Swiss-Prot record:
It is a multi-pass membrane protein. The gene is TIC214. This is Putative protein TIC 214 N-terminal part. The keyword Membrane applies. It comes from Piper cenocladum. The lineage of its organism: Eukaryota, Viridiplantae, Streptophyta, Embryophyta, Tracheophyta. One of its GO terms (cellular component) is chloroplast inner membrane.
Amino acid sequence: MILKSFLLGNLLSLCMKIINSVVVVGFYYGFLTTFSIGPSYLFLLRAQVMEEETEKEISSTTGFITGQLMMFISIYYAPLHLALGRPHTITVLVLPHLLFHFFWNNHKHFLDYGSTTRNSMRNLSIQCVFLNNLIFQLFNHFILPSSTLARLVNIYLFRCNSKILFVTSSFVGWLIGHILFMKWVGLVLSWIRQNHSIRSNKYLVSELTNSMARIFSILLFITSVYYLGRMPSPIVTKKLKETSEMEERGESEEETDVEIETTSETKETKQEQEGSTEEDPSLCSEEQEDPDKLDETGRDPSEWKGNI
């Protein structure tokens, strides 16, 4: 009995040491970073669902993993974190990306030209898929921010003694989490494609493929608004701070004006009260003299002697 309790106590202590070890905690936080960013997965799912070519699927996966890796490194490397959050970086990344999308969506008829142009545009489309999945990860850092990504690591990093071991284990956990996520997405899509009930209804499949781009754009817009509502963009917060400061200044000026008006009104009322108190003694003296001079009938007492 004593031996069993001793073994049980040692086993529990060993389990507690393993759970509280830096490696396990690093695996845990690295695995949680897989689910910390939401909108960045939409381009990957769109490429996996809509693109039938394997090259585009591979390029989308590569761009997604590269962008996630840059985001993961920016947590631990402060210069990269500051560089991604600067307004010049936003201008350099966002404007060319939007212009390229505008040009690409309005010039799709170039794909119908000769074989050389078709091959070049095909390679360009593969590169475009890669850049979409790469750049959108960087957009999520400051345009669609998720505070979970930075807080997951900062909670434990300042308490950890062996930071290199923690970073390595969290990177391994992050990589395992993304591999599992990609495998899960592939299994779900393969099940949908192999399902006979879905494949038999060709009208439903054609309508779904035609409206897939619109569905993903709506989902992206809703998720973006949700994230921006929870944590506003740094581009907007500066203007909001300025407007709040102007409102506070206006409120303070209004309060001072109200105080000045109230003080002036109190001074006027005090002066009126003092003036009324000065007029009251004269009235009282006149009222005291009148009863001596006037009788109840209203006559003067000197008139009484004449009458007598």
